[in-house]
């Protein structure tokens, strides 16, 4: 996924690759010729973002996007787009007339960096950022595989 498939040479804007010093011949990511940052908020930078060779300007770890605003959790509903997934958030809505709850959901498109491997059913934590496209305003910060046990171990809608 990190191969150069575009017609133009992809490079990180903050990294100078034409150095005449001892770093000659080293690939970005192997010799320290890679820009990455700690986004804070208690999220660790993935190993693939530090050691990888991909170039993604919309990645929160290696690009120019900052995370601010809401932090949300949900389940990956669709991973069919390129570098974009649909996160489904289930919730309960109270109907006053009947004194009951009804199930509802919302779909949120989110940009996924190449440092993550996301499949349908995985639990996702996303963070709000500036608008990345017409509909995308969130970025994937953490992926919890579907089979692992974590804080998502409880079933949804158990209060009924």
From Swiss-Prot:
InterPro entries: NA-bd_OB-fold, Ribosomal_uS17, Ribosomal_uS17_arc/euk, Ribosomal_uS17_CS, Ribosomal_uS17_N. Keywords: Cytoplasm, Ribonucleoprotein, Ribosomal protein, RNA-binding, rRNA-binding. GO terms for molecular function: mRNA binding; rRNA binding; structural constituent of ribosome. It holds the Pfam family Ribosomal_S17. SUPFAM superfamilies: Nucleic acid-binding proteins. It comes from the Eukaryota. GO terms for biological process: translation. Its main location: cytoplasm. GO terms for cellular component: cytosol; cytosolic ribosome; cytosolic small ribosomal subunit; plant-type cell wall; plasmodesma. It is found in: Cytoplasm. The keyword Protein transport does not apply. The keyword Cytoplasm applies. PANTHER family: 40S RIBOSOMAL PROTEIN S11 FAMILY MEMBER, SMALL RIBOSOMAL SUBUNIT PROTEIN US17X-RELATED. NCBIfam families: PRK08572.1, uS17_arch. Belongs to the universal ribosomal protein uS17 family. This is Small ribosomal subunit protein uS17z. The gene is RPS11A.
């Amino acid at each position: 996924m990190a191969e150069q498939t575009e017609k133009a040479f992809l490079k990180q804007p903050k990294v100078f690759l034409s150095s005449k010093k001892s770093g000659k011949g080293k690939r970005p990511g192997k010799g320290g010729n890679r820009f990455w940052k700690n986004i804070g908020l208690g999220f660790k930078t993935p190993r693939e973002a530090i050691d990888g060779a991909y170039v993604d300007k919309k990645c929160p770890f290696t690009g120019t996007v900052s995370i601010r605003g809401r932090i949300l959790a949900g389940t990956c509903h669709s991973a069919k787009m390129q570098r974009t997934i649909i996160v489904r958030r289930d919730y309960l809505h109270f109907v006053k007339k009947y004194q009951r709850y009804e199930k509802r959901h919302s779909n949120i498109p989110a940009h996924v960096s190449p440092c993550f491997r996301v499949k349908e059913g995985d639990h996702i934590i996303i963070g709000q950022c500036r608008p990345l496209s017409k509909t995308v305003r969130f970025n994937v910060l953490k992926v919890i595989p579907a089979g692992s046990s974590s804080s998502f171990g409880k079933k949804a809608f158990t209060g009924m």
